[in-house]
Amino acid sequence: MEVREELKEIIEKAKEAAIAAGELPEGDYAAVQRLEVPKSKEFGDYSTNAAMQWARTAHKAPRMIAESIVKHLDTPLVTRTEIAGAGFINFYLAADTVYSELKQILKAGPSYGDLPKNKKDRILVEYVSANPTGLLHIGHARGAAYGSAMVNLLRAAGYDVLSEYYVNDAGNQIDHLAESINARYLQLCGLDAEIPEDGYHGQDIIDTAKNILAKDGKKYLDMDEKERLEIFKELGLQEKLADLKKDLQEFHVDFDNWFSERSLYPDQVNEALKVLKDEDNMYEKDGALWLRTTKNGDDKDRVVIRTNGVPTYFCSDIAYVGNKIRRGYNKLIDIWGADHHGYIIRLKT
């Protein structure tokens, strides 16, 4: 047992002994609330205001209560006590107590102070989840530090926690990645090509194209463009994910699972949409499929399937929430960037 908790029990026993001795009246005494490390060492290793806390119940001055508590303390944990001010009790730990605790710290290692396992809750924490189309920025770094710290704290508190990175490897942004790599590859091969309007212009795209050219040469030039784009999509995704993992590992952030958005299509997405339709949470308008998010306070309903039949990013997000729940997690924590604040109401729907 931690010294602080053990000392609280000792104070409670001293109070009961004082009641049994007739020095304190019987009553509904609250448990010891505060047992803190004083700011100054001269006030001991721990200090409590329990006597002041119990003054109203005991109908006595806090100093008198403190004197009774100190009188009935029976423990080798402390070498001496001191009553200060209006009734604070300061405790000075015995050297053997300190050394014993140090031994426990060394024996337990990083798990020292961890709470017993919580068998009731399973928590999934999803964070960072930057698109695998470029480099991490300072906003991602903030989310990585915050999320990693939260995961570590929850585990220390006894929770069963899974840390997860949601890989956005489906949708238009991955198509634009492939198109951008393709344009840079063609340019490096001496051909005219332009980055698409919604493409990526960073140096990292040029580097990816250079790596492909250095490894495979010009063999992709003879391919049908559609086939070449599919290959560049996979090669680009692999390289970007490898870069993301490397940067995060250097930041001492590791994930238990990297979840692919693609794995949700088509079955899990279709199932999620069916559930929402059956519950009358969706409707068709202007050739698109909409989710009724206004009923939960959103400023407008949101498109899930566009008029051209292409799902929005929100569509797979809906299926992803259901996937987490089906995996047995009853508490979900999503750590997003500041630009995602509008998604909160949508996902709650």
Regions found by a protein language model. Name each.
Residues E2, T57-A58:
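Short, surface-exposed ligand-recognition loops at beta-strand->loop->(often short) alpha-helix junctions
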Residues E16-I19, E26-T48, Q53, K60-T349:
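NTP-dependent nucleotidyl-transfer catalytic core
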Residues M1-G27:
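Generic start-of-chain signal for non-secretory N-termini
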